[in-house]
Amino acid sequence: MSEPLPSIPYDHFAKVDLRIATVLSAEPHPNADKLLKLKLDDGTPEGRQVCAGIKQWYDPSALVGRQVVIVANLEPRQLRGEISQGMILAASDLRGAPAPDGPADGAAKPGPDARDVILLTVDRAVKPGSKVS
């Protein structure tokens, strides 16, 4: 587990607009090995596109129809030539337990492939664009 960040005032957290979105389509990013390009129904007429570094953990076709939690008010940015209009939230979890004969001081660090990434979602379907609070 990573070290916790310092506390922030509630006003800072209140500025983050978390919403539910439904994945309409997902495909490999044409210019990046680790990214998927997703089209989302976020409750707006135009929807949005988000690029997410989840290709290693998710098959694009398995994402279609899933509901995810997004940060809806991030400024759009270019990721390898594609616009990303938000961020999909996910948890990162180390795979497996440390070997019983491993170093006791935690000196051995797992590589980036030694983790799982799990998308945050809702336990039942809700309207796209619903606010998360």
Predicted regions and their residues:
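Phosphate-backbone binding interfaces of nucleic-acid-interacting proteins
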Residues: 1-133
